């Protein structure tokens, strides 16, 4: 990357890759994915350990829901149940909790949660679920009724940016600024997002403008905070004497002696950054990346 290095190659601060881009290796293809991953081997005499932050983004969202509640001195409905579940069981499954509260199956609960997190519209959600737009709309309404804190947090972060007193940025766990400095007319029509001076010149000084893409604010905050968790974890394991072989999204890969060695690395990763809910890492071990299985 000629403008910025790969260790900060994305807007959110997440690592980018090229030559090759390992983040784009096929993972869902049951034949091709493992075949390519079997080419990645540990050091001689050791095993490959893939250690990833379990449901990193949902945990961060739950953390911010708690932080938002404390800041407003008003608990977002439903968030305390998630906090307690995580504290009682660090391995708790966010999507199963959502599905149970909303009265839907886990697959739909997960799809809706991720759709809201990434700013997906009703039409795309309907395609993902294989249902009509009207059914998707009703399913989303039921979700918000039973699990209201997700929508309330999304709107809260968005409102923070749209406040006239806002500097146009929010900060991640480690203080990285997520900037929203493009503008467009405050209408329902589609407009190109522009820097403020250009937007005023294009649409006139009397046109009411709004910040663009604020509906993506929670997603940007969570992505930046995920990077703010993963990078300190990499530093901690390096200082402990283990250099990661790969870093793919929320996963670090190592050459390890045995399961106990992998568990020690997972412990370092889990404690690199403190949240209001406990972190948990899943461990897969095997003779290669493609043959690593959960332990």
Segments and roles (model prediction):
Residues 1-295:
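Conserved catalytic core of nucleotide polymerization and phosphodiester-bond processing enzymes
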């Amino acid at each position: 990357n000629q403008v910025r290095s790969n260790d900060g190659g994305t807007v959110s601060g997440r690592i980018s890759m090229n030559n090759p881009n390992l983040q784009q290796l096929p993972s869902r293809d049951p034949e091709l994915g493992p075949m390519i991953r079997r080419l990645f081997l540990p050091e001689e005499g050791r095993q490959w350990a893939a250690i990833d932050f379990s449901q990193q983004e949902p945990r961060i969202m739950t953390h911010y829901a708690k932080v938002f509640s404390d800041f407003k001195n008003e608990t977002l409905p439903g968030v305390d149940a998630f906090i307690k579940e995580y504290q009682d069981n660090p391995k708790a499954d966010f999507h199963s909790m959502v599905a149970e509260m909303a009265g839907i199956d886990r697959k739909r609960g997960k799809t809706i949660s991720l759709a809201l997190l990434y700013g997906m519209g009703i039409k795309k959600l309907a395609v993902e679920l294989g249902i009509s737009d009207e059914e998707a709309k009703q399913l989303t309404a039921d979700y918000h009724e039973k699990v209201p804190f997700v929508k309330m947090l999304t709107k809260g972060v968005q409102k923070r940016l749209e406040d006239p007193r806002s500097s146009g940025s929010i900060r991640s766990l480690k203080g990285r600024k997520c900037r929203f400095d493009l503008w467009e007319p405050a209408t329902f029509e589609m407009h190109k997002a522009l820097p403020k001076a250009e937007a005023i010149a294009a649409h006139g000084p009397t046109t009411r403008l709004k910040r663009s893409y604020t509906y993506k604010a929670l997603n940007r905050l969570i992505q930046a905070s995920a990077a703010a968790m993963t990078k300190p974890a990499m530093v901690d394991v390096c200082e402990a004497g283990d250099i990661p072989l790969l870093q793919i999204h929320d996963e670090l890969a190592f050459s390890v002696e045995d399961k106990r060695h992998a568990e020690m690395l997972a412990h370092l990763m889990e404690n690199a950054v403190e949240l209001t809910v406990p972190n948990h890492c899943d461990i897969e071990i095997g003779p290669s990346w493609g043959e690593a299985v959960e332990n």
